Amino acid sequence: LIAVLLIACDSEKKEQKDQINKENKSSAAFVLDNAKNSVEWTAYKTTEKVPVKGKFKKVEITSGGEGNSVKEAIHNAEFSIPISSIFTSDSSRDYKIRKFFFGVMENTKLLSGKLVIENDSLGYADITMNGITDKLPFTYLIDDKKFSMATKMDVLNWNAKSSLDSLNLICKELHKGLDGISKTWSEVAINITSTF
């Protein structure tokens, strides 16, 4: 009798769980959380402006991100990106960026933001980093079910000079150019794609 009750209760719990999962699935045609999202960046070192490429391996959609078109799904989508998901194909570089750049900032375990589409080619992201929220304009293109955006960010707009100085100090020799000057640029190119 106990075994029958346990099996019956277990089946009831499974049915309730299945019902909750069905309710959480969106009926929207385009769901950003289900898309293949890529957040890639290019920073620069040395006076010759040598590119250093990387990406964030994880992005979480925290609000919105659904619609009956790609544009609708992107517009007003809110996201967060864990700093721990940074990846440059060099684990020692990843550690230095996390500790000596982001680690110097205020409240920056996550980068967060909201995407706003203004017209058929322009938008902006309200990016929160280092305790500061600032507007970052971008250009974008929608090709079938793929959204691509590009922008350039100046980290000084997020009061990140001390973070930049900290990273440049720890990477002093690695960031020296042919002229013998060590430089870490404040400009970062960002490319984001979402394929639905």
Predicted regions and their residues:
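Sec-dependent bacterial lipoprotein signal peptides
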Residues: 1-7
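Low-complexity, acidic/polar, glycine-enriched regions of mature
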Residues: 9-196
